């Protein structure tokens, strides 16, 4: 087992990364109070809920559960309310803990619920997908979608602890595994070319679910994110770099309808668009773009999206949270392994990059 810490002063917390982790031993120091609400979904609960419920009950905790439907399209205010209903019906108090057992949607919703319930209760993350292990479970961003934009309602809510168990990735559908690899590739492209080389050498093993390689990929990804979050928790500056591919990707997700494409799939094509625009600006080479596309394809991810009318695409981009004073800011590549956030780009070139990476 490997341990990383997200350094946030007195709110410092550990990320435990390994296979067949013992929840009783690892969670005991971090569960405050006697009441624990496990939030999961209909896919994950039959696989792992009893394991965590029994571990917590053996610690003398009162455990209640809230099982939600599975999917991004349920990440809304109506389903968030089901968590509040469960907490209130169980009579839980402000000293309770909300434990997220699932992927990014469950983590986002359970975290947001924990930030709101009685103005804030304790929160624990047990991410069961690769994407949530390397991205959404680390750093405290929680929230839900609104019909007009993704993650428009939310709060920063740091967990007490994160448990990333590689054994749980064995039950992950192939498409979900690939979606997680998109975020892993993102860390390499935005800040670590050595990691990109490692991914190029080990992508076949990652796709084949080699537990040691997955643990190394999760560790390196989380270490990268933890460093950025420690420097910029509330995304005032450097943390925005973690949105490489996301402005384009969110537009794809929003237009197609949440859940039609997985988040990681949309981000993958978004990173291709960002690389394409970076090349059109003269920042990276054609070879760099080809290298970006190749590693994304090797992870069984899309490098183009269905045709989306340009006005619709741009309209969805305009709802992005990185819009500042009416100006769209994009995360682009100065070179592979070095990203920047900028508003200094030619909009016509951006349109070309969008259109060039769609298929009929």
UniProtKB/Swiss-Prot annotation:
This enzyme's EC code(s): 4.2.3.4
One Gene Ontology biological process: aromatic amino acid family biosynthetic process
GO cellular component: cytoplasm
UniProt subcellular location: Cytoplasm
Key word Plastid present: no
Role this protein plays: Catalyzes the conversion of 3-deoxy-D-arabino-heptulosonate 7-phosphate (DAHP) to dehydroquinate (DHQ).
Family: Belongs to the sugar phosphate cyclases superfamily. Dehydroquinate synthase family.
Residues reported to bind Zn(2+): 183, 246, 263
Cofactor: binding details: Binds 1 divalent metal cation per subunit. Can use either Co(2+) or Zn(2+).
Database matches in InterPro entries: Dehydroquinate_synthase (IPR050071), DHQ_synth_AroB (IPR016037), DHQ_synth_fam (IPR030963), DHQS/DOIS_N (IPR030960), DHQS_C (IPR056179)
GO molecular function, one term: metal ion binding
Broadest EC class assigned to this enzyme: lyase
Short name of one Pfam family: DHQ_synthase
Listed name of the protein: 3-dehydroquinate synthase
UniProt KW keywords: Amino-acid biosynthesis, Aromatic amino acid biosynthesis, Cobalt, Cytoplasm, Lyase, Metal-binding, NAD, Nucleotide-binding, Zinc
Main location as per UniProt: cytoplasm
Binding annotation for NAD(+): 70-75, 104-108, 128-129, 141, 150
This protein's record includes keyword Lyase: yes
Reactions this protein catalyses: 7-phospho-2-dehydro-3-deoxy-D-arabino-heptonate = 3-dehydroquinate + phosphate
Pathway recorded for this protein: Metabolic intermediate biosynthesis; chorismate biosynthesis; chorismate from D-erythrose 4-phosphate and phosphoenolpyruvate: step 2/7
């Amino acid at each position: 087992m490997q341990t990383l810490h997200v350094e946030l002063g007195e709110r410092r917390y550990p990320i435990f990364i390994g296979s067949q982790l013992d929840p009783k031993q690892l969670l005991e120091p971090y569960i405050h109070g006697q009441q624990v609400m496990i939030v999961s979904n209909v896919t994950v609960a039959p696989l792992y809920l009893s394991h965590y419920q029994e571990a917590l009950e053996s610690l003398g905790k009162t455990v209640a559960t809230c099982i939600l439907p599975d999917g991004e399209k349920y990440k809304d205010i109506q389903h968030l309310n089901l968590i509040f209903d469960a907490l209130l019906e169980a009579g839980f108090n402000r000293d309770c803990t909300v434990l997220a057992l699932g992927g990014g949607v469950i983590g986002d919703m359970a975290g947001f619920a924990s930030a709101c319930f009685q103005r804030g209760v304790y929160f624990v993350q047990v991410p069961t997908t690769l994407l949530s292990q390397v991205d959404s479970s680390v750093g405290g961003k929680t929230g839900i979608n609104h019909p007009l934009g993704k993650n428009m309602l939310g709060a920063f809510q740091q967990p007490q602890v994160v448990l990333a168990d590689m054994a749980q990735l064995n039950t992950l559908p192939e498409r979900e595994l690939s979606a997680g690899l998109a975020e892993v590739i993102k860390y390499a492209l935005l800040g670590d070319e050595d990691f990109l080389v490692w991914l190029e050498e080990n992508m076949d093993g990652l796709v084949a679910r080699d537990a040691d390689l997955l643990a190394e990929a999760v560790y390196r990804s989380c270490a990268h994110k933890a460093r950025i979050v420690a420097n910029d928790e509330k995304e005032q500056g450097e943390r925005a770099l973690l949105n490489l591919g996301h402005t384009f990707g969110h537009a794809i997700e929003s237009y197609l309808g949440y859940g039609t494409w997985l988040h990681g799939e949309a981000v993958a094509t978004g990173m291709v668009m960002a690389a394409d625009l970076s090349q059109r600006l003269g920042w990276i080479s054609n070879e760099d773009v080809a290298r970006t596309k190749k590693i994304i394809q090797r992870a069984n991810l899309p490098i183009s999206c269905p045709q989306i009318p340009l006005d619709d695409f741009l309209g969805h981009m305009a709802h992005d949270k990185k819009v500042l004073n009416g100006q769209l800011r994009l995360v682009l590549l100065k070179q592979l392994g070095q990203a920047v956030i900028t508003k200094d780009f030619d909009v016509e070139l951006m349109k070309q990059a969008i259109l060039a990476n769609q298929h009929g």
